[in-house]
Amino acid sequence: MPSQKSPTKRSPTKRSPTKRSPQKGGKGGKGAKRGGKAGKRRRGVQVKRRRRRRESYGIYIYKVLKQVHPDTGISSRAMSVMNSFVNDVFERIAAEAGRLTTYNRRSTVSSREVQTAVRLLLPGELAKHAVSEGTKAVTKYTTSR
């Protein structure tokens, strides 16, 4: 005689996730289901994981764009290219400033090393403008403190 399983009752300790009413606006929005890893379970209830923040220079690139060309927009792909460019230049300047600090047997990167790194990395007139803008920014920062 084959054994039949009887329907098991749920134990009171395990809870099912609470049912929510559907959101306005149909698909999409904040409450839309996203792919990826599921959250951890705590006492039988699914715990929602916080999404990791993606840092970007996007807002600053946009502010500069609006200062230079107020009526011009930027696509997300162009923004991605600009973000990669800023990251690349930042890494190059930081690496060069670090090397200069090591050559001078110092342990702290100062504004002088950063300025020299900019002069070494950027060509001619671009380096002059970058140095003057950097000096202006450092002066503004020190006077505001």
Curated annotation (Swiss-Prot):
One of its GO terms (cellular component) is nucleosome. Keywords: Chromosome, DNA-binding, Glycoprotein, Isopeptide bond, Nucleosome core, Nucleus, Phosphoprotein, Ubl conjugation. A motif (SPKK motif 1) lies at residues 6-9. Pfam families: Histone. It comes from Parechinus angulosus (Angulate sea urchin). Core component of nucleosome. Nucleosomes wrap and compact DNA into chromatin, limiting DNA accessibility to the cellular machineries which require DNA as a template. Histones thereby play a central role in transcription regulation, DNA repair, DNA replication and chromosomal stability. DNA accessibility is regulated via a complex set of post-translational modifications of histones, also called histone code, and nucleosome remodeling. Glycans are attached at residue 132. It comes from the Eukaryota. A motif (SPKK motif 3) lies at residues 16-19. This is Histone H2B.1, sperm. Gene3D superfamilies: Histone, subunit A. The lineage of its organism: Eukaryota, Metazoa, Echinodermata, Eleutherozoa, Echinozoa. Residues 1-52 are annotated as: Disordered. A motif (SPKK motif 4) lies at residues 21-24. PANTHER family: HISTONE H2B. Belongs to the histone H2B family. There is a cross-link at residue 140 (Glycyl lysine isopeptide (Lys-Gly) (interchain with G-Cter in ubiquitin)). The nucleosome is a histone octamer containing two molecules each of H2A, H2B, H3 and H4 assembled in one H3-H4 heterotetramer and two H2A-H2B heterodimers. The octamer wraps approximately 147 bp of DNA. The modification Phosphoserine is found at residues 16, 21. Contains 4 SPKK motifs which may interact with the minor groove of A/T-rich DNA sites. Phosphorylation of this motif may regulate DNA binding. This motif is reiterated in both termini of histone H1 and in the C-terminus of plant H2A, but its presence in the N-terminus seems to be unique to sea urchin histones H2B. GO terms for molecular function: DNA binding; protein heterodimerization activity; structural constituent of chromatin. It is found in: Nucleus; Chromosome.
